[in-house]
C-alpha cells in the first residue's frame, strides 16, 4: 500500500531539497495515512462497547461518513480528473463503516504545480487539524470507559465529525438539515467560522444549508444566517458569528492560506508551554494585519534562499496556526514556532516580525515536516531513545532521532542563509553570513555523531552521507573569517558548557 522511495528522491531530500516528484510522494503518502487513521477511528467506534460509544453515536458516525461520501461524489463527478482519482480508492477503505456503501476516494492529490484542487470532502479530511482530532478520538475510544471528564471529551470529539461532514456538504453545494452540538458554548464549523451560542454548555444547534446559505438555529436565540464564501470563511451580520480567516495564496495561482485561530484541535492536548512554545492564540484585527504584512513578503524572501524553498512551502504548507508570543521573546524580537507530526501541513507560529524571519521559520519547520514524512516511509536508523548526544542548539542531551531532526533543519538553514548572503547587499548580506556561519558550525559539530552511528540502516547511511556531502559543498562559498571564528567559538563554548552540565549530573563515586 505504501510506496517505495527511489534513491534519487532520497538523495534530494537528504540535501534538504526535493522536487515535485519528491514532495508529491510525501504529500500523497501522508494523505493515505490520514485515511487509514480515519478508518481506525471508525473501526474503533464500531468495536467499542455501549458504555464508550453507544448505538446512537455509531449510527451518527455512519450518517456523517455517508454525507462526506455524497459531498465528494457530487464534486468529483463534475471533474473528470477528480473522478479518475476516485478510481484509485484505498483497498480496504471502500466500506469504512458497516452500512456505508461508498468509500471516500483515496488520497489522490495533484503534484505541486498542477492546479487540481481537492474536493471539499477531501480538503476537510486532509486538513492538518483533522489529524489531531482523529488521534484524540482514538485515544478516547481505546481507553475504554473512563472518567466523566474523559467521556465528555470523547462525546465532543465524535460530535466534531458531524461539523466536518456538514462543512464538506455545504462546500459541495448539497442541501441538508442536520443537528450539531456546540462545545462549551461554541459551535466551530472548520474553515467557515464559529458561532458563540446563547447557552454556555454543550447545546444542540440545528443547521440547514441551501444555495450557499447556512441557517443556524439554537434555543433562546434568533436564527443566524451565514453566507459561504469561495474558499475559507463565511460572513454573517450576526454578532455571535466569527468568520474564519485566510491569508492570500503564497503564489499568485495558489488558494488562500488558512490562518486558523478557531479550530478546537489547533493546539496539543498536553501542556502547550514546552520551553518557549506558547499556547494557541485568538487574533484581533491588529494581529491579523501584522500577519498579513509579514506574509506578503514571505514568498520573495523564500525565493532568495533558492527556488526550491518556495516550491516546498507551496507544496507542503496547508494552514497556519497562530500562537501567543512568549513573554521572554517580546514583540518584534523574534517568534516561536513548531510543527506537529499528526498535523502534517500545519505550521504553528507566533506573529512573525517580518517576512525574512518568517521565511526562515518556514524553512526550518518544513524540514521537520519533510523528515517526519520521509521516516514514515523509510527507516533511517534503529537507535534507541536514550538522550546522550550533544546538539549545539540545545542545552540538554538529545536522542539520536532528535539529533538527526535538528541537524537536518539546521543544514537547511545554513543553505538558506548562504544563498541569501550570495544574493543580497549590505547590511542584509552581513546578517545572512552571520546566520549561515552559526548554522554551518552547529551542523559541523553534530554530523560526526550522526555519520558514525552503527544504528543507521542502508538508506539511512545514504541519507546521512548525502547530508554530510551537502555540508561540505558549502565550503565552496565560505562565510567571512570573522563570522566563522565567532560561530566556531560559540559552538566551542556550548560544548564546554554541555560537558560541564553532564559531568555535574553524573553520580559521584560511591554515591
Please give the residue ranges for each predicted region.
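Type-3 copper protein
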Residues: 1-321, 438-511
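Extended, well-ordered protein cores
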Residues: 260-272, 314-326, 337, 341, ...
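Metalloprotease/metallohydrolase-associated module, dominated by Zn2+-dependent proteases
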Residues: 282-285, 292, 298-340, 352-353, ...
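Post-HEXXH active-site segment of zinc metalloproteases
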Residues: 342, 352-361, 369-401
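Alpha-helical phosphate/pyrophosphate-handling elements in metalloenzyme active cores
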Residues: 348-349
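Long amphipathic alpha-helical segments
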Residues: 367-379, 413-414, 418, 422
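A short, terminal or domain-edge coil/loop segment
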Residues: 371-382, 386, 429-441, 479-491
Amino acid at each position: 500500500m505504501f510506496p517505495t522511495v527511489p534513491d534519487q528522491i532520497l538523495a534530494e531530500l537528504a540535501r534538504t531539497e526535493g522536487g515535485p516528484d519528491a514532495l508529491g510522494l510525501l504529500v500523497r503518502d501522508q494523505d493515505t495515512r490520514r485515511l487509514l487513521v480515519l478508518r481506525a477511528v471508525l473501526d474503533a467506534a464500531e468495536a467499542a462497547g455501549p458504555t464508550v460509544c453507544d448505538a446512537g453515536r455509531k449510527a451518527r458516525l455512519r450518517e456523517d461518513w455517508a454525507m462526506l461520501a455524497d459531498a465528494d461524489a457530487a464534486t468529483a463527478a463534475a471533474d473528470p480528473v477528480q473522478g479518475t482519482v476516485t478510481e484509485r480508492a484505498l483497498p480496504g477503505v471502500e466500506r469504512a463503516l458497516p452500512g456505508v456503501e461508498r468509500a471516500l476516494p483515496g488520497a489522490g492529490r495533484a503534484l505541486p504545480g498542477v492546479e487540481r484542487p481537492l474536493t471539499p470532502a477531501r480538503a476537510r479530511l486532509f486538513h492538518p487539524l483533522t489529524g489531531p482530532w482523529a488521534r484524540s478520538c482514538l485515544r478516547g475510544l481505546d481507553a475504554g470507559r473512563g472518567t466523566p471528564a474523559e467521556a465528555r471529551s470523547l462525546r465532543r470529539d465524535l460530535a466534531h465529525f458531524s461539523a466536518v461532514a456538514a462543512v464538506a456538504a455545504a462546500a459541495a453545494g448539497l442541501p441538508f438539515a442536520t443537528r450539531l452540538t456546540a462545545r462549551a458554548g461554541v459551535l466551530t464549523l472548520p474553515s467557515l467560522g464559529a458561532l458563540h451560542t446563547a447557552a454556555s454548555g454543550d447545546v444542540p444547534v440545528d443547521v440547514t444549508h441551501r444555495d450557499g446559505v447556512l441557517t443556524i438555529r439554537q434555543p433562546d436565540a434568533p436564527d443566524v444566517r451565514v453566507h459561504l464564501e469561495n474558499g475559507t470563511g463565511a460572513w454573517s451580520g450576526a454578532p455571535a458569528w466569527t468568520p474564519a480567516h485566510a491569508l492570500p495564496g503564497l503564489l499568485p495561482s495558489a488558494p488562500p492560506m488558512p490562518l486558523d485561530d478557531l479550530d478546537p484541535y489547533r493546539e496539543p492536548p498536553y501542556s502547550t508551554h514546552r520551553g518557549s512554545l506558547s499556547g494557541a492564540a485568538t487574533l484581533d484585527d491588529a494581529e491579523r494585519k501584522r500577519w498579513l504584512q509579514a506574509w506578503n513578503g514571505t514568498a520573495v524572501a523564500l525565493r532568495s534562499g533558492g527556488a526550491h524553498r518556495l516550491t516546498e512551502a507551496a507544496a507542503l504548507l496547508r494552514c497556519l496556526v497562530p500562537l501567543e508570543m512568549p513573554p521572554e521573546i517580546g514583540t518584534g524580537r523574534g517568534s516561536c514556532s513548531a510543527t506537529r507530526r499528526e498535523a502534517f501541513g500545519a505550521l504553528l507560529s507566533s506573529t512573525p516580525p517580518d517576512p525574512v524571519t518568517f521565511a526562515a521559520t518556514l524553512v526550518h519547520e518544513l524540514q521537520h515536516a519533510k523528515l517526519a514524512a520521509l521516516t514514515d516511509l523509510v527507516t533511517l536508523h534503529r537507535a534507541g531513545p536514550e538522550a546522550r548526544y550533544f546538539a549545539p542548539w540545545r542545552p540538554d542531551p538529545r536522542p539520536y532521532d532528535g539529533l538527526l531532526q535538528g541537524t537536518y533543519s539546521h543544514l537547511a538553514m545554513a543553505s538558506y542563509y548562504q544563498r541569501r548572503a550570495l544574493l543580497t547587499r549590505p547590511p542584509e548580506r552581513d546578517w545572512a553570513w552571520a546566520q549561515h556561519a552559526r548554522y554551518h558550525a552547529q551542523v559541523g559539530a553534530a554530523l560526526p555523531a550522526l555519520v558514525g552511528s552503527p544504528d543507521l540502516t542502508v538508506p539511512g547511511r545514504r541519507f546521512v552521507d548525502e547530508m554530510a556531502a551537502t555540508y561540505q559543498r558549502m565550503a565552496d562559498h565560505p562565510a567571512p573569517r570573522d563570522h566563522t571564528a565567532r560561530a566556531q567559538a560559540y559552538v566551542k563554548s556550548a560544548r564546554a558548557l554541555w560537558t560541564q552540565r553532564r559531568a555535574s549530573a553524573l553520580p559521584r563515586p560511591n554515591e
